[in-house]
UniProtKB/Swiss-Prot annotation:
Dimethylallyl diphosphate binds at H41, H74, H124, S225, S226, N227, S269. It comes from the Bacteria. GO terms for biological process: dimethylallyl diphosphate biosynthetic process; isopentenyl diphosphate biosynthetic process, methylerythritol 4-phosphate pathway; terpenoid biosynthetic process. This is 4-hydroxy-3-methylbut-2-enyl diphosphate reductase.
Length: 314
């Protein structure tokens, strides 16, 4: 039984930055540091930061006045920012810069009075934050999850219209949605290329290559991780048994029946230590070789806030 590792896999630049912001804030200011929502969607990462003194909350009313709070990588609405300012909270913003780019697109549409359509998953923190950048009551922003949602949009063809997407979607699904939007609204405007982030795109391409050679694909990532779920779905669509796991403890021996090659990848919020723990566990179950697929190199780095960067240099 062989193990094949996808490349690239695991942490992206936005996740690296978000985790660094929490760790550096704890180092500079000491515990407790409050974090609104899980800074990234991975249970292992969140538990590790809790042990270091981070306190995770869902809403700002759980944060004491004048405390330090970090916004998660998924971003927040303008209403949340305004509440933090009103209460005198010191904020470090760990929003992924690629999410911030989408926020700016929405804010521009709102300012111009252009109706906006967001392709995304209802209830996901990134979507909530992105929708919350639109404040023009004379126009509006609409969320669509399916082609059927697009067919039912109550927007006239002659209206000014723009679209944007959640950054962690399936590339294949999103291209079909964009095509449906352009068919219904030929004059619709949008980004020059879709908003799906480089890391999501790269990991989806890597899992395609993995699924061509493996009979089982294990995706290391938490159940609430959008990009991890998309990786498992993509491998499954290619006819391969695919399982989303938090770690080696989730692996069932029967998954390995008649399997010669196991492919392993990890979502953008899953640390490499979890991948290696899965490899080690599979070796105890009979895996004899480990190889890395050749994939694209990622060199993207996002800087942490200046106040924390000074400390980082020291």
């Amino acid at each position: 039984m062989n193990i094949l590792l996808a490349n690239p896999r695991g942490f992206c630049a936005g996740v690296d930055r978000a985790i660094s912001i929490v760790e550096l804030a704890l180092e500079v200011h000491g515990a407790p540091i409050y974090v609104r929502h899980e800074v990234v969607h991975n249970r292992f990462v969140v538990d590790d930061l809790k042990a270091k003194g981070a306190i995770f909350v869902e809403e700002l009313d759980e944060v004491p006045d004048s405390a330090i709070v970090i916004f998660s990588a998924h971003g927040v609405s303008q209403a949340v920012r305004q509440e933090a300012k009103r209460r005198g909270l010191k904020v470090f913003d760990a929003t992924c810069p690629l999410v911030t780019k989408v926020h700016m697109q929405v804010a521009r549409a709102s300012k111009k009075g252009t109706k906006a359509i967001l392709i995304g998953h209802q209830g996901h923190p990134e979507v909530i934050g992105t929708m919350g950048q639109y404040y023009n009551e004379q126009a509006g922003i609409f969320l669509v999850e399916t082609v059927e949602d697009i067919a039912n949009l109550p927007i006239h063809h002659h209206e000014d219209l723009t679209f944007m997407t959640q950054t962690t979607l399936s590339v294949d699904d999103t291209s079909g949605m964009i095509e449906a939007l352009k068919n219904k609204y030929p004059a619709i405007q949008g980004p020059r290329k879709n908003d799906i982030c480089y890391a999501t795109t790269n990991r989806q391409q890597a899992v395609r290559e993995l699924a061509k050679q493996a009979q089982l694909v294990l995706v290391v990532g938490s159940k609430n991780s959008s990009n991890s779920n998309r990786l498992a779905e993509l491998a499954s669509r290619m006819g391969v048994l695919a399982k989303l796991i938090d770690g080696p403890q989730d692996i069932l021996p029967e998954w390995l029946d008649n399997v010669e090659t196991i492919g392993i990848t990890a979502g953008a919020s899953a640390p490499e230590i979890l991948v290696q723990s899965v490899v080690a566990h599979l070796q105890t179950l009979g895996a004899t070789s480990v190889a890395n697929l050749v994939g694209c190199e990622e060199n993207m780095v996002f800087e942490v806030p200046k106040e924390l960067r000074v400390r980082e240099v020291k």
